[in-house]
């Protein structure tokens, strides 16, 4: 079975002045804040007619304060996220492992439970991080394994 990417779910960017960047994307593109933290702001870039869009994860532009040193394992900075179905998730995770890719899995919990999702991250040959994310309304209640 071939992977079927449904949508781009998220784009993460580092910015030099977070308040200025947020204001720009709000004023120029009309994006709305979904969640805001001191060094990270999630802006809704569109609605999706998909499990993630209807299940609590709209298309997002995520802005990160460039001055703050981030723990990449705990953030979603500098990556592209592609939505896949929950039915494909485990099969794709196994296929990527068989291809020899180093994977990191994240079940979105705690302050990110609102995402209602699980993700697998891996790098392309140039070191760009790719995320496959699937809507999973039960993810927040599951024990993190990796």
Language model features with spans:
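Short secondary-structure junctions
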Residues: 30-36, 102-106
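Short aromatic/hydrophobic contact patches that present stacked aromatics
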Residues: 10-12, 42, 79-81, 119-121
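Short beta->alpha transition motifs characteristic of CBS
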Residues: 113-115, 133-139
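Short glycine-enriched loop/turn motifs at secondary-structure junctions
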Residues: 4-7, 73-77, 113-114
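Amphipathic alpha-helical segments
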Residues: 17-32
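N-terminal beta-strand motif that seeds the catalytic metal site of vicinal oxygen chelate
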Residues: 1-19, 80, 136-146
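Vicinal oxygen chelate
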Residues: 18, 81-126
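Conserved short beta-strand elements that form part of the metal-binding/catalytic scaffold
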Residues: 32-74, 86, 129-134
